[in-house]
């Protein structure tokens, strides 16, 4: 089942270091089954705020996405993003959950 990786940037403390992250990420993705859907393209915030940029990618499975995220190549550079910018990152399975199953086993019960 396809999985979407969504990262929303909420703030940047050191752009130079974040640019090092962006420059270093491509080699970690070589040979990976990631389909880039949107990466820091123009956007419009409909609700909420504090959005500086958005990344959306499609992976063939949750396992494939997690394997890349936990790979030694990505582990070696992800601190450049984590230490120098504030992001929310999620993996979302494709599909639509029925209303009665939405938010089950989550903190919002």
Give the label of every model feature segment.
Residues 77-90:
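C-terminal structural segments of small proteins and small subunits
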Residues 1-53, 60-70, 93-109:
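Short S/T/G/P-rich N-terminal loop/turn motif that feeds into the first structured element of a domain
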């Amino acid at each position: 089942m396809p999985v979407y990786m969504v990262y929303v940037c909420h703030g940047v403390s050191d752009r130079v270091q974040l640019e090092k992250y962006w420059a270093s990420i491509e080699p970690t993705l070589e040979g990976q089954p990631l389909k880039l859907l949107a990466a820091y393209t123009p956007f419009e915030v409909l609700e909420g705020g504090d959005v500086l940029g958005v990344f959306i990618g499609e992976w063939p499975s949750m396992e494939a996405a997690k394997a890349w995220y936990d790979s030694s190549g990505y582990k070696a550079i992800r601190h450049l993003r984590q230490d120098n910018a504030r992001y929310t990152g999620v993996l979302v399975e494709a599909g639509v959950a029925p209303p009665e199953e939405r938010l089950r086993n989550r903190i919002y019960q």
